[in-house]
Amino acid sequence: MESRLKPGLIVLCGPTAAGKSSLAIAIAQRLGSPILSADSRLVYRDFNIGTAKPTPAEQQQVPHYLMDLCDPRQVFTVGDYQDCAVPLIQQLQEKGMLPLLVGGTGLYIKAIVNGLRFPRIAPQPKLRSQLQALGQPLCHALLQRVDPVAGDRIHVNDRVRTLRALEVFYVSGDRLTDLQQEQPPSYPILQIGLDSDRLEARIQQRTQQMLTSGFVEEVQGLCDRYGSDLPLLNTLGYRQVCAFLQGSLSRSELPEQIVLQTRQYAKQQRTWFRADSSIQWIDAEAGNRLERALDLIERFRKSEGV
């Protein structure tokens, strides 16, 4: 009687604009694997162009999960992501599949790979309104005082995660950093990183593609539907387009500012992922990147029996 293969997980991570989505689709098609998103903005509906969400045509090529999970006005925490992702991975594994977790949100990936557990504290709308009234610079400075580790990890302009960390502190009395615990999964995991020494050129190219694909129109529609004070509109790319729509950025300055801020974000992602010695890196510019990834996966499957 043939022995059943063990469950496993493949992770494809790396900085933004490195080409993870296209490589993931190619890998998934070869393996018959589903793709699970590990991107903190893809969980929201209607945020499509500026998040580089896989297009409907791309999603038809391979099953995609963990996208379009909630309304942009909802608070969606890392714990919420974990609650969705963990049972989904198990369900897919039980069907004999080898899921492919793809994205650049390091904390989402760590939540799965390391089993990082998060405090289950419900959103506090009144507290959030009070904090938002203080303004993001003051909120982040406050976070640096009450939880310096989280303050260093969370970008000064990341309003969503800043508010969440402060919310946890003021509701529980404990720092988010102290409440996080790790319970790694029992199944083997292969982490593949994708990076490029031409990342800046890739970022410039993708920014232009977003703008010609209707990014400004997408943001205008989001402002009309949800209001310009929607926290998600203060995230990378959307913040710059809002500034353009409000007249504080010119048409020529808009792509420059998006590229500049995206480069800074990519640098943070690199620092996060490069700190993990278990990640095996592939050059995004290599012509054999797909073959290289498939070779890593094949050796992983043979050694782990997955």
UniProtKB/Swiss-Prot annotation:
Keywords: ATP-binding, Magnesium, Nucleotide-binding, Transferase, tRNA processing. Its EC number is 2.5.1.75. Residues 39-42 are annotated as: Interaction with substrate tRNA. Pfam families: IPPT (PF01715). The record marks T105 as: Interaction with substrate tRNA. GO terms for biological process: tRNA modification. Substrate binds at T16, A17, A18, G19, K20, S21. Its cofactor is Mg(2+). ATP binds at G14, P15, T16, A17, A18, G19, K20, S21. InterPro entries: Dimethylallyltransferase, IPT, P-loop_NTPase. The keyword Magnesium applies. It catalyses: adenosine(37) in tRNA + dimethylallyl diphosphate = N(6)-dimethylallyladenosine(37) in tRNA + diphosphate. GO terms for molecular function: ATP binding; tRNA dimethylallyltransferase activity. Monomer. Catalyzes the transfer of a dimethylallyl group onto the adenine at position 37 in tRNAs that read codons beginning with uridine, leading to the formation of N6-(dimethylallyl)adenosine (i(6)A). Belongs to the IPP transferase family. This is tRNA dimethylallyltransferase. The lineage of its organism: Bacteria, Bacillati, Cyanobacteriota, Cyanophyceae, Synechococcales.
